[in-house]
Amino acid sequence: MKKKHKRLLITSGIFCFLSCAVFFILTTLKENISFFYTVSEAIVLPNNQKPIRVGGMIVENSVIRSESEVIFQMTDFNKSVMVKYQGILPPMFSEKSGVVVQGKMFDNGTFLADTVFAKHDENYKPKVLK
């Protein structure tokens, strides 16, 4: 086999290997990366009953707690949506703070959350230090 053919074969093999590796890495990341929509984006999405994630800020004086559920308004400062959630809220959940909710959006503008994640900045300090 000539040097030129051998080099072409090795280059082709490396290219195929790298292409397969990139494909598998991206496929795995797609399943694990957690993107979220803004409230404005989520409202205009077609209602296909697939779970989505929506991020925004909790509107001040909107949190209503009962024994079985928590209802609050979430906004992206353009539009807002009412969120209903049954379960234990994260410790950092508070009004005027960031939140990401995972669940389903309904046609009436209500979001039924399965999971609530409290967002915070990278400079988190415990309440003791504040």
Curated annotation (Swiss-Prot):
Residues 1-7 are cytoplasmic. It comes from Wolbachia pipientis subsp. Culex pipiens (strain wPip). Heme chaperone required for the biogenesis of c-type cytochromes. Transiently binds heme delivered by CcmC and transfers the heme to apo-cytochromes in a process facilitated by CcmF and CcmH. One of its GO terms (cellular component) is plasma membrane. The chain crosses the membrane at residues 8-28. Keywords: Cell membrane, Cytochrome c-type biogenesis, Heme, Iron, Membrane, Metal-binding, Signal-anchor, Transmembrane, Transmembrane helix. The keyword Ribosomal protein does not apply. Pfam families: CcmE. The lineage of its organism: Bacteria, Pseudomonadati, Pseudomonadota, Alphaproteobacteria, Rickettsiales. The gene is ccmE. It is found in: Cell membrane. The keyword Transferase does not apply. Residues 29-130 are extracellular. This is Cytochrome c-type biogenesis protein CcmE. Heme binds at residues 120, 124.
